[in-house]
């Protein structure tokens, strides 16, 4: 077991690129809890999406996670910036709406590369470098239950569930907990008025999910009190009904 350290624990958070994003909310929450946070993002993705980029400062690490050669670099750079990493929070995604009929092979492959393959390789790199005391390692990944009209996103996100749950078993000897979070429909700026109204109507609580809702669950999982929760797919969606 490693000797205790007074240094703040270090977390890497991917998918940090917009002020209203889940990744940004998680970064803020963990900083408030005393973590040293290293953010990773890809500003070009947000510029290409309908909601666009905003004026949030650039992430500590800019990386296109579709390129497998960049993934080990994310952990290496985080170690250089902040020290040994003991939490990996995966909030990144590729999400371009399309159907079974009109999804291109290129789009499908990019969704799988970013949402599934990058998740696997980032967890792999994290586990390989983890040297903290048993019980202090954390992995949390954001998933989705989308299916129709967002097929490549939903299919590639579903793979995350299996990757992370496998990691919970395979990294148990190191004392790393691994969980998946489904935050439901979260108001990060992508909903138009009619979509937001439809989501509210399906929720047991009369509001939209906020990025802070998901961030609050992540901060609990990353706390000592979250150590007993492991290998789970957790819903933090306010009771969203199909």
Residue ranges and their predicted role:
Residues 203-214, 225:
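A conserved structural motif in NAD(P)-dependent oxidoreductases
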Residues 91-97, 238-239:
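Conserved NAD(P)H cofactor-binding loop of Rossmann-fold oxidoreductase domains
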